[in-house]
Amino acid sequence: ITSAWSSHGDQRLMEYCNSSRDYGTRISEEQFDQAFDQWIADQTPGINFGKDIKCLITIHANLSYLSASVPNGETFELEHIIARKRIDAADSSRPRHILGNSLGNCMYLPRGINNPKKDKTLYEINDHNRYSQLIKESQYFSEDEMQKAMQALTASDYESVNGLLRERS
């Protein structure tokens, strides 16, 4: 995520082959946090999830909420937590202002949940607490956070929406 390999692939590979760098050398948690925070800060507004986001959300989902609570064999889809339709309605300008393509706005949902959900939140379709466990295990926005995000969208308060998305990331 630090783009250490971009445009220096062969040179960088030689550094590892000659042992001036080593994949086996652990970085500190602080170094990782700094690199991750910088990567989050460098995100640009948009709506389509990039390869890096898809990769990270797949790893997270498989190590957390998908591994324990969702049946095997189920088909999954990437989902915009703040629905794409709602983001498009609030931010249709170019360039975009909302980080709809961010890690904080992405999760996997089983197709059976995602298709009927459309532009709603999981809270809006959570009849009889049907999705409460998924909401908890996926680190979905709290109801209060989701309400703040919807109010900020309505008010075109892009910074507040982006702040919530960055925080969830």
Please state what every model-predicted region is.
Residues 18, 48, 62, 72, ...:
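Detector for Asparagine
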Residues 84-86, 116-119:
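Flexible loop/turn segments at secondary-structure boundaries
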Residues 127-169:
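C-terminal, well-folded lobe of enzymatic/effector domains
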Residues 1-81, 86-91, 108:
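Intrinsically disordered, low-complexity N-proximal targeting/linker segments that flank membranes
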Residues 3, 55, 65, 101, ...:
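Intrinsically disordered, low-complexity segments used for protein-protein interactions
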Residues 76, 89-115:
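Short beta-strand-alpha-helix junction that forms the catalytic/metal-binding core
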Residues 77-79, 105, 114, 144, ...:
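Residue-level signal for functionally critical sites in structured catalytic/ligand-binding pockets
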Residues 120-125:
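Short cysteine/histidine-rich zinc-coordinating motifs and their immediately flanking basic loops
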